[in-house]
Amino acid sequence: MLKIDGLTKSFGSGSDKLHVLKGIDLELNRGELVALMGPSGCGKSTLLNIIGGLLPADGGEIKLQKRTYGLKGPSSVVDLRRDLVGWIFQDFHLLNNLSALDNVAMALELSGTNSTEAEQLAAEALTKVGLEDRMHHIPDQLSGGQQQRVAIARAIAGNRPLLLADEPTGNLDIASGKEVLQLFKDLCHDDEKPISILMVTHDPELASSADRMLLLRDGKTEASDIRSAWGLDKEQDGEEE
């Protein structure tokens, strides 16, 4: 569903040039929840920004369904962001004066969907995330976990096949974080329209509950587990020596 080959990205120039991504190879299957971990500043958010069409790479290629991209700027991949990729952040970015339904519908209307269809798609998305009885509530009337569910509904409305989640539980308590993770699993394993989720997180419990975990380190990704993601294997090796 998503395939990345040899993706590279640097910032700066000359002696100050910083090579952040050094040949990323990554695959994400349909209906799969993958956690991406790594030390702060290793390029996790940079990678998500490139996959999401917000930042061009220096080299390499991305294939998402039938779309090939990666090296062009955001203005060249507007359709990608509109039709194929949804975003979730730790901040909900909801408009406080609008209901949950209107928050989701407005995002669809801004991408070109007519108001009648936008409202229908918004209602379907909110139902899918378990907020069918909270559609007409404004954000202040919702818990933190419910607000994040509205943000998730906004991201998946219109049947986007890929969801990029950057620290999605960062502002939630433990219980709400677990609810969001379970929702992610339900969305990925949906019998009719499964989506794929690439989730950046520093939470080891969250990461270990994903279908698969990747570690971004030294500019490349590799299959991982919790011990290696936190550097515990290296510590153990040092003790044995």
Predicted regions and their residues:
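ABC family nucleotide-binding domain
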Residues: 1-209, 213-216
